[in-house]
Every structure is written in structure tokens, then in C-alpha cells.
Amino acid sequence: MEQEVDPFVQKNLRWNFAVNLIDISFITLAMSLISRETIMPLLVTSLTDSKIAVGLIPAIFSISFYLPQLFAANHAESMKRKLPFVMFIGAVFERLPYVLIGFSILLFALDLPLLALVLFFIFIGAGAFGAGVATPSWFTMIGKVLPVHRRGIFFGLSEGFGTMMGILGAFVVGVTLEQVAYPLNFAT
């Protein structure tokens, strides 16, 4: 049984599919470049000997990402337009903190490693918080602009392309970490 698709959604389907596919593919690539499982622990161990600090990476990220969703979900349902909210939160609160991590590492890693570490955790928390606030609205938006029968292929392709780009990204990260001097190698 095929579900009827709203004419407006059908008219804009190619655009919405392509733009969101590119966005998710590059987010997946970006997250592989700064992997919480490999790159972030390596960075933290260059700033401190504390194993607890390494363990805080997934803890801070998870709490900062999942907890806001509990409160943002109701707000997401009540918004008439999701895109402006998602774009603002995504740009300012989800993505900008990662740029600020780079600057923090560049400026403070050598002389003030504890400050660099604290700023790293603050910005990781801020980025995850931004993602957590935006995620319910983003999924609601995707639910409106992509028909049910296109969502599986959308998520499969976007994650697949992002992961394939991440393989190339892993090579670039490996070369960068090896050939660029610390702390510029992590700040790049």
C-alpha cells in the first residue's frame, strides 16, 4: 500500500533529499575526523595523564546530547517552521564549538594544557548540547520533507557516503597527526 505524498513535498523532494543528503554526509565525515573513540582520547592524553579525563569524553557528550532532547522534543512539535531553528542551532551551538576547540588547542595546549582541557570539555559539551537541542526539530523536519518510502534510502546513502568519505578522512588525519607539529596537528 503506497502512501500518498503531499504535492508540495513531492515538488521539493529532489532538493530536500539532495541538500540533506549532502549535510548528513559531511556531518558524518566531520565526526569521523574528530572521532570521540580515537582522536579525542588521543588529544586528551596529550593534555593530561588522567584516565578519568579520557573517560569523561563519552560521558559529557552523551549527557549533553541526550538530555536536552527530552526538553526540546515538545518545542520541536509546536514549531510551525523547523528549518530556521535547526540552521541557527546547528551552526552556532552544534558546529561552532568544534572550531573553538581548535583555537583553544592552538592557543593553550603548550603553555596552559589544563585550560585547553577545560575548554575542550566545555566546547564538547556545548556542541553536543546544540546537537541535542536541534535533533528533535531536525527529525521532525525530515519527517515532513521526505516521504516515508524515501527515508530508508536517504539515511542509508547519507551515512554510507559520509562513512566512505570518513575512510579518506582517516588517512588525512593520520598524515596530519604524524607530519604536523603538536598542537597544530590537533588544531587543524
Region roles according to the model:
Residues 25, 90-134:
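Hydrophobic core of transmembrane alpha-helices in multi-pass small-molecule transporters
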Residues 2-76, 83-105, 156, 162:
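Helix-loop boundary and gating motifs at the non-cytosolic
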Residues 39-46, 74-79, 101-111, 163-188:
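Transmembrane alpha-helix termini and helix-breaking/packing motifs in multi-pass membrane transporters
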Residues 50-58, 116, 120, 186:
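Juxtamembrane helix-start elements in MFS-like secondary transporters
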Residues 47-49, 80, 142-147:
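Short helix-loop-helix connector
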Residues 131-146:
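Intracellular juxtamembrane helix-capping segments at the cytosolic ends
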Residues 149-153:
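Conserved short cytoplasmic inter-helical helices of the MFS fold
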